[in-house]
Amino acid sequence: MSRSTLRGSAITAEIRKAQAAAAAAPVAPKAAKKNAKDKAVAAAPKGAGEIRIIGGQWKRTRLPVAQRPGLRPTPDRVRETLFNWLGQDLAGWRCLDAFAGTGALGIEAASRGAASVLLVENDAALVAQLQVLQAKLQASAVRVQRGDGVSALKQATPASLDLVLLDPPFDGPFFEPALQAGAQAVAAGGFIYLEAPRAWADEEL
């Protein structure tokens, strides 16, 4: 296990199993409600589904999933495997979710006590949705920023992060630049989580 990536370990295999199992399962459709109290879900574009936070202070909180090109929210089972391995208590952790999308990964970290979580997203509609969610949860540790995830990592103070979360669009050229930038931003003993369409060999990371 290196400080720069979760690789060459049982957790990698377990996450891949969870990803494979979840791939066939569609995101749960949003139930129709006349008086929706969940403003974040109500703010989601037509056709949106939802996923849920699975641990911590916001356990079972619904997160909207908009029908946006390339948006792939990390399924519950995958997040459960990841965060069970990282630990239920992330108190004091500094985290950056570089391609936040629905915010599922970063909000999960904040729910488990992370001291600071920066959600970076380039899609304006998703940024607005994340801002509504942050306000609804009164998540003072969470900051939402519109922009490029790789640039955000490059701008981070070197060795300042305990957890870097990378789930970039699979059809974009983001993997190597994000890993390189993340390796500079993550502290000794910290971790980078990468979701990718293929397995990466150790020498590539």
Q: Can you say where each PLM-predicted feature lies in the sequence?
A:
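Class I S-adenosyl-L-methionine-dependent methyltransferase catalytic core
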Residues: 1-205
